[in-house]
Each structure stands twice: as C-alpha cells, then as structure tokens.
Amino acid sequence: MKQFKRFAWLFLLLIPLLIVAGCGKSSSSDKTVKIGIMGSDEKIWKPIKKKLAKQGINLKLVTFTDYNQPNAALTNHEIDLNAFQHTYFMNTWNKAHKTNIVSIGKTVRAPLRLYSKKVKSVADIKKGDQITIPNDSTNEGRALHLLQSAGLIKVNNKVKLPTPKNITQNKLNLKITAVDAAQTPRSLSDATAAIVNNEFAAEAKLPNKECIYKEKLNKASIPYINVIATNKADKNNKTYKKIVKAYQSEATKKLIKKYYHGLSVPAW
C-alpha cells in the first residue's frame, strides 16, 4: 500500500511536467506566418487561413490601408509575406529603397479603371474637367498611359513611368491631380473622373456601371500581375510555398469571382 501511494505521488508530481512538454511540442509544430494584405482582400484570405490551419500553419492576416506600408513592414521583418502589389510596383520599390523583395507566386490581374459619377462615357468629359490619379510613381505612370489609351491625353512614350510633366498633349486642358491611391474613390465627389485601383474600388463598393474605361488585359499588362512577395532570403521557404499553393486553388478562383465581379481575375 505504501509503495502504491509513493507511485501515486510521483505520478501527480510528473503531470505538470508532462503538460508543459505536450504544450511545447504542439507550439513548435505550428508555424505562424504573418502576411500583409489590403483590407478589401480579407474575405479572400480568411478561407485560406482556415485551410492552412489544418496543415499546422497559423496564418495571421495583417491589414494595411495604403501602398507604402506593406513593403516597409516586410523589409523590417514585421511581416513575413505580403500580397498587394504588382510586379512593376515591387521592382520600382526595390530600386528606390534598395531592397530585395521577390515574388513567390501570382495572384490576380486587376485592370486599372476610370470611374465617374458625373459622366457616362469618356466622350462626355469636357474641357477643363478634373481627373484624379494615384500618386505613387508606378500607378501614376500606369494611370497616365490609361488616359492616353482612352484618347484623352498623350505622353512621352520614351518615359516608362511618366508623370504629369511628361504629358505632351492635353487638348481638353484637363486638370490631372495625383492623390493618395486610397483617396481616389473619395475624390469622385468633386472630380469628373478618377482612376481607382481595384482593391480601393472594391472597398468603396464602386459599381461597374460607373466604370467608363478600363485597361486592356494583354502583353503590355503582364508586369501588372499581382503577386505574393517575400524577402529574397526567404524565397525558398517551404511553408511559404504551401501558402502560395493554398491560394492558387479552384476555391480561391470562385471567391475572386464572387467578391470582385470582374474587378480582378485569377492570374495563375
């Protein structure tokens, strides 16, 4: 009886140690990965987060409100991945900030669109009207090329990323104003038209009927395919590759179609 009691006490003393050991094993097997996204993309990523949890990957969604934050956070290792930018934006950022951010997987193609609450077609735009465009260098240049494609202006085609200073013809004397990309939907209350990136258009719930012109999906738009990005040192990370694979699924294609109604289309 005494021997049984001795073993019983020993077992009770070991229980806390066994619990701690068990918890340690569980936490080490779960991999936590932080990915930076724009707020409008949460509804796409939440089902992917659930799917990855079954594989032992804890995907944390970190939302941002403008284009300057996600790459800075990635470089500073505040997040591990981001999924908000196209290749051209990423390359321009790397050059300007001397960083080594690389793509590890394609997400969507998102044609840039010209919206208006005041006119129903490009032909209705009048002399002296105001048009707002994103002010980051990549999307500003892209927006000016879109206005040229719409027949509203001409730019110096020798310049890859034109600014308003590179406009060579503006017959309607349009007032082209560059604002923060996140503010372009709001500018529609004052401006005749605005070029709005798809995530901000989705967030503002801009109806398709207010789109009066959009970018063509062709070879010229390939650099504008959106990607999942990470720091170059982590490009071969196996867990990150599993996240890309989880995103690039038929289920995600259906979600993109459901929530974006053609604003974005799968690019893989």
What are these regions (language model features)?
Residues 92-104, 118-120, 195, 203-216:
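Ligand-binding "clamshell"
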Residues 66-67, 77, 81-91, 180-181, ...:
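Beta->alpha turn/N-cap motifs
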Residues 18-22:
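C-terminal motif of bacterial Sec signal peptides marking the signal peptidase cleavage site
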Residues 106-115, 140-148, 202-239, 244-245, 247-268:
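Periplasmic-binding protein-like
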